[in-house]
Amino acid sequence: MGAIHDEPFTACGDETECFGGNREGSQSFHSSSTKEENLEDSYLYLVHQRSMSIFFWDERANTGVAGAVDEGKIIDFEFLNPDEKRIIEEHANKEREEGVDVILVNFDRREYMLNLRRWNMGTSPLYILVSGRYNVVKGCRLKEGNEIRIWSFHFDDQLNLAMVPLTPTESG
């Protein structure tokens, strides 16, 4: 299970008031903690919204499942910085073992370490979160059919994803 993140995060947009500037195609982001300066130049990007959860628990297999996201369904590729794009590309071309390390912050502020990779399968590349998805599914008690929205942001130069449920899960 991931660690609890002590600082509440606030995303600007429909639900909350915006603090700070806005960059075209993104929403500004801030932490209400004293570490706000670390997020001063951070932007929040909507990466993906899915009516069937990208993560869910498969009762029959008794395992956590992470669905792949088709490249064409990613809403904004600006969530990756140039170095992260290069790493993803190198992994897809089998030039490196791992993709990009990601911290996923869920709706109750628990953090999970994952690895984002691109797999070239079929006509469109797939982006998938690996190495820890079981913990996300189990810790969040996600079931097939839960609706989620995934946002990205950088904190201290680390790629983070925020998972926001659109439908209730067993844990919240």
UniProtKB/Swiss-Prot annotation:
Any one GO molecular-function label of the UniProt entry: DNA binding
Question: Which keywords does this Swiss-Prot/TrEMBL entry list?
Answer: DNA-binding, Nucleus, Transcription, Transcription regulation
| Disulfide-bonded cysteines | none
Q: Which GO terms describe its cellular component?
A: nucleus
Keyword DNA-binding appears in the UniProt entry? yes
**Subcellular location per the Swiss-Prot or TrEMBL entry:** Nucleus
Entry-linked InterPro entries? At2g31720-like, DNA-bd_pseudobarrel_sf
Q: Which residue ranges hold the DNA-binding region?
A: 69-169
Please state the protein's primary subcellular location.
nucleus
The lineage's top-level taxon is Eukaryota
- PANTHER family membership: B3 DOMAIN PLANT PROTEIN-RELATED, TF-B3 DOMAIN-CONTAINING PROTEIN
Q: What is this protein called?
A: Putative B3 domain-containing protein At1g05615
